[in-house]
Amino acid sequence: MLVLTRKLKEAIQIGDDIEITVLVIQGDQVKLGINAPKHVEIHRKEIYLAIQAENNAASFASKTSLERLTEQLKHLKGGKQA
């Protein structure tokens, strides 16, 4: 992990397109401003992890639904009703 120290109003550049600036320091909180292209998704880590968990759950539900549908189609193709 790269560790950098920045003061108020100082910035960090990531590649050509992303700039992170320290906007406010209040006690134990730091407010950051992030300039990045619109196609770059930026989330707080806890939000990112929640999105990943929801996507994984949706993927599993979709797989289960697809498996059920496949079984029903097999029964119908064989002349049997599910």
Swiss-Prot record:
GO terms for cellular component: cytosol. Keywords: Bacterial flagellum biogenesis, Cytoplasm, Repressor, RNA-binding, Translation regulation. Homodimer; the beta-strands of each monomer intercalate to form a hydrophobic core, while the alpha-helices form wings that extend away from the core. Belongs to the CsrA/RsmA family. InterPro entries: CsrA, CsrA_sf. This is Translational regulator CsrA. One of its GO terms (molecular function) is mRNA 5'-UTR binding. GO terms for biological process: bacterial-type flagellum organization; mRNA catabolic process; negative regulation of translational initiation; regulation of bacterial-type flagellum assembly; regulation of carbohydrate metabolic process. The keyword RNA-binding applies. It is found in: Cytoplasm. It comes from the Bacteria. It holds the Pfam family CsrA. A translational regulator that binds mRNA to regulate translation initiation and/or mRNA stability. Usually binds in the 5'-UTR at or near the Shine-Dalgarno sequence preventing ribosome-binding, thus repressing translation. Its main target seems to be the major flagellin gene, while its function is anatagonized by FliW.
